[in-house]
From Swiss-Prot:
Protein known as: Acyl carrier protein 3, chloroplastic
Domain Carrier as annotated: residue spans: 52-127
Biological source species: Hordeum vulgare (Barley)
Chain segment of the transit peptide: 1-49
Pathway: Lipid metabolism; fatty acid biosynthesis
Length: 132
């Protein structure tokens, strides 16, 4: 029979939640221990740090700038490159966002924008800083 003792277990960055009810130990011979862990679904998830209305406005601007066909889904995780955008298209998207939200985006920040969520998060940050 195998036994395991310990005082503490810690993880630097949890990847999945584990249901302790499904944790089991077994061993056929001395020195052999088997550990079976079953992941459980997370109860909540943060999908986007930007405000939903900002994400929706960014989606509209991206669809307009890239002439995205009707019925094509554009959401927070959509990459501009997946919609066929090149670097010039991205610059035009940023210019449209600056005009819509009355903000100014630094070139280094603009280069870091790859998804709708990236743009929306940056916009919320700049709008908050502007109103402070």
């Amino acid at each position: 029979m195998a036994s395991i003792a310990g005082s503490a277990v810690s993880f630097a960055k949890p990847v999945k939640a584990i249901n302790t009810n499904s944790l089991s130990f077994s061993g056929a011979r001395r020195g052999n221990a088997f550990l079976r862990l079953q992941p459980v679904p997370m109860r909540f998830a943060v999908c986007c740090s930007a405000k939903q209305d900002t994400v929706e406005k960014v989606c509209e601007i991206v669809k307009k700038q890239l002439a995205v066909p009707e019925g094509t889904e554009v959401c927070g995780t959509t990459k501009f490159s997946d919609l066929g955008a090149d670097s010039l298209d991205t610059v035009e998207i940023v210019m449209g966002l600056e005009e819509e939200f009355q903000i100014s985006v630094e070139e280094t920040s603009a280069q870091a924008i790859a998804t709708v969520e990236d743009a929306a998060t940056l916009i919320d940050k700049l709008v908050s800083a502007k109103s402070s």
